[in-house]
């Protein structure tokens, strides 16, 4: 039986979306937390930008849902997010020569990567084809609009892919850059389109504990208060692509009002460790509630980009872990069974919950990239991320540009077309 035969999805009712269930899982582990004191600033940034290597064991099955934008009639059997990678030799739409905005850390060819076969694959959904990204079509849809990516460094990775794709049609103007290069604004004057990166670690307000005058890597998260770094811009946005996960793989304490209601990776008698997925669920729930209760956000479209997995093998980031594969996994190598799918399932459940509570014309949907990216261990920078001060460490969290991450924008355009 093929993977697709195993994964028939029963439909259910969502006002703007389709839902379904799957039973397949991926079984992977993360190591115990490893706190390094006195690292250089660069090493600290790398740790914070990437997935902390923490073990997360799932001891129960999860009723997993797949949420899809409601298709047009002629596409009623098209599941954009369930499929396989198939050979394709058209190559990438852009190169590291034709896109001037690729950051050094994602410019894998410039940093010495020689193999190129990882570019010769395209995502093939069940029962339909996913068109290649069309910058003209995209810019026509978002003409006169503002779109923001809300999230961490993987969200930034996503927006960097989009910038490369759009710049083949129109080169954007840098409109804003903060002192840490986290919050950015680009403007496409011909189409009057504004693109924003709104950085957030946890979606909700978080404060790092200081112990003996030093940063501890332990955070207090306040579920009653969202991160104003993104929330204060909501009223100006037409589209939001929201994501988060990697910052939660560390010791955190969840506060509601004046009470600590739960924690992650703590060992205290009077506090319950509810795990990463629970903490993420509460953060997304708070974020979606903020959007739904925004009185000046009528008509805003919110898309949740699901969890993007890492692919460390033979260790973890700090124990020699690497990601040296040069081609995708096939479906026989994927066993859906661990935390990646618990997180993804939770995210889809929360976006469905938000959609059911949608107010004042607000719309919610999903960019479900998890399945596609679980199959792409070959797409990470690995050793080719260009940091001369961290030789021996590999980036198996972010994605090369160009690379498999570009499919996220193929999917984004397909979803926007269905909404348009």
Swiss-Prot record:
Residues 52-420 are lumenal. It is a single-pass type II membrane protein. A motif (GDS motif) lies at residues 151-153. Disulfide bonds join 78-128, 99-164, 108-400, 323-396. The chain crosses the membrane at residues 31-51. It is found in: Golgi apparatus membrane. One of its GO terms (biological process) is xylan acetylation. The keyword Transmembrane applies. GO terms for cellular component: Golgi apparatus; Golgi membrane. The keyword Acyltransferase does not apply. Residues 1-30 are cytoplasmic. It is an enzyme of class 2 (transferase). InterPro entries: TBL, TBL_C, TBL_N. Keywords: Disulfide bond, Glycoprotein, Golgi apparatus, Membrane, Signal-anchor, Transferase, Transmembrane, Transmembrane helix. The active site is at residues 153, 395, 398. Its EC number is 2.3.1.-. Pfam families: PC-Esterase, PMR5N. Its main location: Golgi. It comes from the Eukaryota. Belongs to the PC-esterase family. TBL subfamily. Xyloglucan acetyltransferase that catalyzes the acetylation of fucosylated Gal residues on xyloglucan side chains. Predominantly catalyze 6-O-monoacetylation of Gal residues in the Fuc-Gal-Xyl trisaccharide side chains of xyloglucan oligomers. This is Xyloglucan O-acetyltransferase 4. It comes from Populus trichocarpa (Western balsam poplar). The gene is XGOAT4.
């Amino acid at each position: 039986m093929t993977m697709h035969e195993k994964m028939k999805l029963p439909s259910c009712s969502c006002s703007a979306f389709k839902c379904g269930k799957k039973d397949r899982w991926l079984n992977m582990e993360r190591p115990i937390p490893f706190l390094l004191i006195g690292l250089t600033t660069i090493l600290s940034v790398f740790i914070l930008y990437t997935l902390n290597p923490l073990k997360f064991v799932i001891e129960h099955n999860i009723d997993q849902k797949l949420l899809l934008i409601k298709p047009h009639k002629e596409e009623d059997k098209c599941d954009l997010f369930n499929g396989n990678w198939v050979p394709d030799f058209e190559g990438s739409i852009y190169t590291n020569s034709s896109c001037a905005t690729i950051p050094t850390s994602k410019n894998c060819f410039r940093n010495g990567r020689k193999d190129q076969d990882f570019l010769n694959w395209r995502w093939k959904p069940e029962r339909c084809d996913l068109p290649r990204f069309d910058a003209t079509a995209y810019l026509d849809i978002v003409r006169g609009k503002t779109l923001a990516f809300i999230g961490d460094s993987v969200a930034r990775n996503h927006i960097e892919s989009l910038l490369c794709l759009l710049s083949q049609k129109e080169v954007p103007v840098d409109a804003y850059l903060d002192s840490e290069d986290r919050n950015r604004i680009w403007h496409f004057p011909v189409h009057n389109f504004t693109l924003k990166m709104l950085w957030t670690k946890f979606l909700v307000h978080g404060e790092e504990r200081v112990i003996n005058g030093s940063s501890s890597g332990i955070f207090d998260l306040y579920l009653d208060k969202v991160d104003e770094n993104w929330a204060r811009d909501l009223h100006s946005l037409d589209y939001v692509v929201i994501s988060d996960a990697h910052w939660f793989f560390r010791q955190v304490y969840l506060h509601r009002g004046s009470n600590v209601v739960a924690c992650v990776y703590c060992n205290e008698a009077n506090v319950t460790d509810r795990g990463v997925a629970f903490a993420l669920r509460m953060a997304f729930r708070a974020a979606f509630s903020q959007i739904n209760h925004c009185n000046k956000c009528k008509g805003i479209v919110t898309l949740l980009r699901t969890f993007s997995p890492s692919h460390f093998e033979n260790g973890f980031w700090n124990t020699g872990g690497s990601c040296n594969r040069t081609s995708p996994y096939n479906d026989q190598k994927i066993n859906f069974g661990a935390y990646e799918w618990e997180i993804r399932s939770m995210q889809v459940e929360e976006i469905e919950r938000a959609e059911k509570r949608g107010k004042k014309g607000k719309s919610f949907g999903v960019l479900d990239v998890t399945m596609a990216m679980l199959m792409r261990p070959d797409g990470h920078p690995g050793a080719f991320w260009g940091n001369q001060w961290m030789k021996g460490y590999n980036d198996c969290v972010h994605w090369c540009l160009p690379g498999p991450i570009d499919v996220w924008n193929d999917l984004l355009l397909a979803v926007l077309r269905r909404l348009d």
